[in-house]
Amino acid sequence: MDQTSSTTKIVHITVTNGYDLKGFKGDTPVTFVRAEFNQTVLGDSSKVTVSPEGTAKYNFTSNIDLSPDGGGALDDLAHKPLFLTVTEVLPKEKKQKDEKTLILGQAVVDLLPLLEGEESFETTVPLHPVPGSPLETPLPGSKQCSLDVKVFVAEPLLTPAQVSASNLLKVTLEAAYSVPESFIPVGPQQNYMVGLQVPSVGEKDYTMIFKNGNLKLGGEKEPVPRPKKWPIANILAPGASNIPDEFIVGGPYEEEEGELNHPEDREFRNQAECTKKRIVWDLESRCFLHPFAVASFQKRIADCRLWPVEITRVPLVVMPKAKPGKLEKIDDENQLSFHGVAYINMVPLLYPGVKKIRGAFHVYPYLDGTVFEKTKCLFSLFRDTGHHLVQNNKAGGLNSPLSKPLSKNLKEEKPGKDKDTEGRPRLGELQAPSIKSQSSDTPLESEAPLSHNLEGQQYIEAGTYIVLEIQLEKALVPKRMPEELARRVKEMIPPRPPLTRRTGGAQKAVSDYHTQIKSISRAILNEYYRMFGKQGPKLESDIDNETMEERKCQLNYELNCSGKYFAFKEQLKHAVVKIVREKYLKTTAFESQEELQTFISELYVFLVDQMHVALNQAVPDDVPSSTSTIQTSSEQLRLFAFEAEVNEKFEIAAMYYEERLVREPQNLENWLDYGAFCLLTEDNIKAQECFRKALSLNESHVDSLLLCGVLAILLENYEQAEIFFEDATCLEPTNVIAWTLLGLFYEIQNNDIRMEMAFHEAFKQLQARTLQTKLKSTVTIENMEEGVKVEPSFGPWGVVQESTTAIKTEGLSGMRPQSSHQLSPHTNMELHPQPQGPNTALSSLDEFLEESPKAQSESQEPMATGQPLEPSLVQRSSNALLKELTSKKDISKCQDSSAFSPPTQHVIAQPPVTIFMETIRFLMKVNAVQFVHRVLAHELLCPQGGPSCEYYLVLAQTHLLKKDFAKTEEYLQQAAQMDYLNPNVWGVKGHLYFLSGNHAEAKECYERTISFVVDASEMHFIFLRLGHIYLEEKEYENAKRTYMHACKRSPSCLTWLGLGIACYRLEELTEAEDALSEANALNNCNAEVWAYLALVCLKVGRQLEAEQAYKYTIKLKLKDQALLEEIHTVQEMVGFGNPSF
């Protein structure tokens, strides 16, 4: 017994009670229960009489003996259920020797919990009636018949470590749709079969066979949800064939992982699944994977990404000696027919956290060469093994392991062995002569041509596809949990503690000073009343100065003698100290006496001014008129900083960004903008600090996470970069940019599988968003003006615009200003010349572009137009795209077939947006130019991307940043050839000529840009620079009109200054003064503004204001010597304005 217990594990199954039973011959029949497992009868219970209430107490126990190694026995528990058949024993009739029995129903017990580490479980399973059973009509008020079952083992079948390392594979075959028309339900009956192989431990593979598919005519869709069925034949009760709590639920096509999940496939699939013939299985087969089998399974996926799933049909005939109605298959006289194969991409199962693949897969004719090329599989499951492997297998489903693996890598084959280690003949020798394999150990170049599988070719003609689901209990590659990622981010970037409510602060210090001043003034006033009476102040106007001086002396004497003056000073001392510390931030000793005296003078002036403010508040009758101050907003400061960037005044730009941070340190957008500025100046360390501070303010801010990841890559902190990117995808799974950046990171790490996973998810999310956008924009497009076609487009600097190519014949005067235009401070960042940029960042990309074919862009006429391409987001890896450049021919064909539209509309075909171009826009917006060249290479090779107008625009921007004007002009020429009427092309061209000093060409480009109906991505600097050119060429009316548009759209000191200059040159001095006053209010440190204010004041004869403006002009060191000479000339003409006269 000890030896037996150590070598055999026993599963005990006890049937305790039956409920709501009734029989053929009455409501109290005599019944017994038979237990069966794996085609073996485990035993029968004793005969029990059912009570009038329908209850039977069986208390019947049966056992399943398992081998010590588990092996096939454990796998049997996974995919074979326990059958409990309840049979009624009829009373003996006269002259009857044996008892007659009739089956009432059958119950199914799923033993899968034993493989999950459980030692015991109890369940109540329904008893499904067999056809004709009285259980089909339950008693009134009773429930469905059921059995109570207890399952237990003395010790767990698997240790916790084995449970953790093992896995369970479930394969569900739903149906094959749009099958060939030659499949007809009449005539000889056919057995429709599908099979695949699963790697197991050692040298053996398991085969999964799905048999007896049900051929149906079209007419309606298969219902969902519908139950999954056991892949087992000869189940007596129809209801027992359904797997408990397992259903086929379907889902949107776009969420599938197969081949027919694109928008263009929707119509075909709807038609195929509603109106066309189909073969339905709805079977689920399981396979228990031991820890070693899990490793083998994972390795096979990595080695052979595509797995073959074969489909065929075999005729069934009625055998002469068989029982009536029993079908058997002829062994040798009929070949396989309609032998096809579907290729299942199993790679997604190696993605982190992925446990399921479900999708529709095309069926192709089975050809040895093609199958081997795609799957490295040498043998056909059906053809090379013979029909007998599936012929009489009543249990069906997962068969025993074959004697030799059916799908092996070529390098694993060992030719020359006629038998395997167990002495069994080779698989090729087992097959029937009529279906003998045409393949052999010879090279596959001699395989039969396509014409030898004409039946399989019908699958392609009919568009046949199978719907299959492959599911694992546990993911092969664990995925980090969001909680773990959030914890890791917190460890790297601790959240900023909330600011404590400070009782001090500069404003509070000044307020306390005002309070003390008011208190002391009241005390002094009370002392004055005590000495001279309350009527004194009313008669103050009648008192002469001598009397007033005498009273002041008496009051001072009294305050000093009484000690009140000293008390007032002590009362005020603490408030003054707080102002020094909080307002002036002085907490340490001064380095020199001169510095101390300077500070005391400044402090004295401030205290006196604030004393006057407090006294004026205390005496309302004497409140003077206050001068209103203009407080610039955060958006204005960002615009000013942006202007300084473009003009290469980086110190001034940094000052504006820092001012925004001082004003709103808790606003993460301010930190992101400053970080983007640091990226522009290539200060990566400070940029990282800014992005991390933004992330500390909001740990769930996706853009901050992405930018931290980008900086981590640039600084080669790859482990941190992965944490940031993964956390971003967890927080916002629909973010296309997050998935794309994660894929680019994995590409840097040479992790091809995860790279494909990330790009695949990005494609999927972009496809779903494109469909939603298309539905929302349909009505809008229909309501547009005739002759104007609007396409959603992104400008090259990341600002979303409505891009139309219809051109307006009116000039600038006919433009419709958009007063509600919101300006982004980083929408034109590529126009900022970098002071020091890497000269080799794009060299490899430039070389690659030089070798790329240019015939496509050169063949397009400037006004050529075509139909917009629908986004066909093929789910494939970027690495695979590099190997499939031949697919670019499809793009060329689409472009070559583009028709020319009527010349009155000028509609340009817009290419579909790709995940890479969307990522490029994000990176350009934040000035991450160092990372852009890698994404541009992907965009060039992407089937939905390739050379496009926006692609060449981005290239032009990157070279414009380096002041590589020759390359910039070359790429702008390419962009203009692809979209001649794109306003962004002309805008960047204008910037190119402006920066290179060719103002005549720049003027022409800017004028063309502003003549379009829809603006370019960034109009602010187009107006500024065009106005500047007009001023240079003394076209003051055009300059005035241009600057007025700029002031309406996005007012700044420079726009008002330009307007003021134009008005001054037109002798419109009042308008000039107003414009210059606006400019001065926005920035009172601009020397040019003070210079023109001085000129205006000189012209209108205001000497004091002229001198004051001239002083500030000199103090701020005006650099325009010509303007300074003009001021001197006017000063000499009018005779005033220069204090040195």
From Swiss-Prot:
One Pfam family named in its UniProt record: TPR_8
TPR repeats by residue range: 634-667, 668-701, 702-735, 949-982, 983-1016, 1020-1053, 1055-1086, 1087-1120
Biased composition (Basic and acidic residues): 409-427
A single Gene Ontology CC term: sperm flagellum
Tissue expression profile of the protein: Detected in ependyma, trachea, lung, testis, and oviduct, but not in whole brain, liver, kidney, and spleen. Localizes on the epithelial cilia and sperm flagella (at protein level).
InterPro entries named among the record's database cross-references: CFAP70, TPR-like_helical_dom_sf, TPR_rpt
Protein origin, superkingdom: Eukaryota
GO-annotated biological processes: cell morphogenesis; cilium assembly; cilium movement; cilium organization; flagellated sperm motility; gene expression; homeostasis of number of cells; maintenance of cell number
Signal peptide segment: none
Compositional bias (Polar residues): 434-443, 816-827
Principal subcellular localization: other
Coiled coil region boundaries: none
Localisation: Cell projection, Cilium, Flagellum; Cytoplasm, Cytoskeleton, Flagellum basal body; Cell projection, Cilium; Cytoplasm, Cytoskeleton, Cilium axoneme
Stretches for region Disordered: 392-448, 811-874
Keyword vocabulary terms for this entry: Cell projection, Cilium, Cytoplasm, Cytoskeleton, Flagellum, Repeat, TPR repeat
Protein's UniProt keywords contain ATP-binding: no
Similarity remark: Belongs to the CFAP70 family.
PANTHER family named in the record: CILIA- AND FLAGELLA-ASSOCIATED PROTEIN 70 (PTHR44314:SF1)
Domain comment (free text): The conserved TPR domains are dispensable for ciliary targeting. The N-terminal half is important for cilary localization and/or binding to the axoneme.
Functional note: Axoneme-binding protein that plays a role in the regulation of ciliary motility and cilium length.
Name this polypeptide is given: Cilia- and flagella-associated protein 70
